[in-house]
Structures are given as C-alpha cells and as structure tokens.
Amino acid sequence: MSDKNSSQKNWTSWHHLLHKEILGNKTLIPDGANLLIAVSGGQDSMALLNLINDMKTQHNWFVNVWHGDHQWHKKSAKYALELKSYCNKKNISFFFDQANKNNISSEEKARDWRYKKLSERANQLLIENQKEIDIYLLTGHTNTDNAETFLLNLARGSNYAGLSNINKKRLLKHHIFLIRPLLIFSREDTKKFCQLQNIPIWEDPTNCDLTIKRNIVRKEIIPILETMYPGCSKRINSFAEKMSNYKNEQNDLSKLASLYCEDAIGVKRELLNSLCIEARCTILNTFLKKDCTKQLSSKNLTHLASSILVKDRGKIDLPDGFEIVWNKDYINLEKN
C-alpha cells in the first residue's frame, strides 16, 4: 500500500470532507504548497492543524505553524511553550511572536498585529526558499465565525458588501495568500473532531471576557437566537453566502455600467445623473477604485454623487492625493 493510500486509513468524515473541498478547488491549497498555519491553541486552529498535518502526505504539503502570544492572560507564555512542544513531537516547524499587550489593547489592533507578524513570517519563508514560490497562510475560521461577523457588521450598519461571506481565499501581497479552509465546518464540528481525536486544546481565558464584542455575540446573542430559532447560525451563514454572490454580481454589473457611462474624456455627467442615487454611487465607486487605493464610505459617496447632480462644476478632495473634478459635461479624477 502506498504512503498516500495508507495515510487515509485513519481519516474521519471531517478529513474526507475537507479533502473533497480541496480536490474540488485545486487552487485553494495546491499540491506541494508551502503552508503557514496560524494556531492559537483553541479548538478551531487545533482542528485545522491536525486535519492539514494528517493530509500533508496526500498533497505533498510543507507544513509550518505560527503562534502569536498577546500576553492577555498569565498562562499565555506557558501555553506557547506547550504548543511548541506539541509541534516538535509532530516534526512541524514552529514560529512564535510575542506582542506588547499595551500596544494591542483592542480586538482590531490585535488582529492587525497577528496579520502583520504572519506576513513577516511568510516573507521569511519566501527568502529561505530562495526561489519564486507562493506561501499559503491558513486560519481556522469556521462558518460559525462567519455568522458572528455578519451579526456584528449588521449591528454596525454595514452595506451589503460588509455583510458578505468571509472569503475562502484572497491575495494578501505578492506570493502570499490567506486561506480559510474550515468555512465548510461549524464550531460544533471542530469541537467534536478534537474530542474524537483526543487533540489537546489551550483555551484562551479572554474568550469568556464579555467586554469583547465578539464574545457577547458568541456567548449570549447567538445562543439566545438558537433557542428561539434552532439552526439560525446555518441560515445566517447561508444568507451571508448569498450576499457574497450578490456582491459579485453587483461588481460585474457596475463595471459594465461604468464602461457605458465613460468615454475617452471621462464619465459623462448627464448620463450618470439620469440614474438613481444608488446606481450613481456604485458607478462612481467603480470609477474611483481604478486609481484610489482607499475606498470612500457610503456616506461620502452619497455626498459626492449628490454634489455632482446639483452643481454644474466643482471639485472634491479625495484620499491618496486625488481630487474628483467635474464640469457641465464630464467627471474626471485628477492628481493634486
């Protein structure tokens, strides 16, 4: 029996489901890929680590682990050492970074720090390989995380783009991709998998801190909704997926509409102004994204579209040193 066939002998239904997902999307995690898995020690990331490590022979993957210590609780350094020992026993390369907790006092700052350090480690792997390869950063996001994010963004007043699914794959920078393979699983799935496989878990005590907004959604709001409407998390996740499809559809249609409104001189003002405010905002956003890296908020886009409608000529300063200028006939983007 070949190594590849024998490696499947002890696979669970979760292994086979993830394997099917990867085979169905060859570009998600290609065979022979260099992987850097972000592992916190919680059930989701530990499930991801073990699933990927069990499947690495099948796909000829090179597996590395990165762990970030936020120093948010007294045992964090101890957890990091224990996780390193766990990886060493499995012959998995382990990378570790420790934050200054005073510099990551919020969820957003902590997330930015994690992705910054992950990218630095990925760059290190690129340099060490001394050849042009891709690095795949893997995180343990599940569809339960997706439902939580949807509710948080809905409460913040996000537009339809903000209510879309978490992307399975996106390019972070040249040769570095962010991959979320576990979006086909729920948090209940990762819990059962870890229990069945006797996988150790290092639970972060801050996950129970109800001053953190996501924890309130996770520990209080979703359980109440599940009691009222059993299975609501799956339906929320399904709706977020539909919103992703809607976003993709809108992006494609807005590109066509933008081309229709443009010629070699610029965007035709009269044609743009003949459309509803929502369509004008969408087309202006598509037009601006060609050069402006920083996207305008919905509020600023609405203000811009309204100004272009009521004034025959004018200009408004934009991020990145640009300004949008218009006269009676045309709208253009210029560098200050």
UniProtKB/Swiss-Prot annotation:
It comes from the Bacteria. Pfam families: ATP_bind_3 (PF01171). It catalyses: cytidine(34) in tRNA(Ile2) + L-lysine + ATP = lysidine(34) in tRNA(Ile2) + AMP + diphosphate + H(+). Coiled coil: none annotated. Gene3D superfamilies: HUPs (3.40.50.620). SUPFAM superfamilies: Adenine nucleotide alpha hydrolases-like. CDD domains: TilS_N. GO terms for biological process: tRNA modification. One of its GO terms (molecular function) is ATP binding. Belongs to the tRNA(Ile)-lysidine synthase family. The N-terminal region contains the highly conserved SGGXDS motif, predicted to be a P-loop motif involved in ATP binding. This is tRNA(Ile)-lysidine synthase. The gene is tilS.
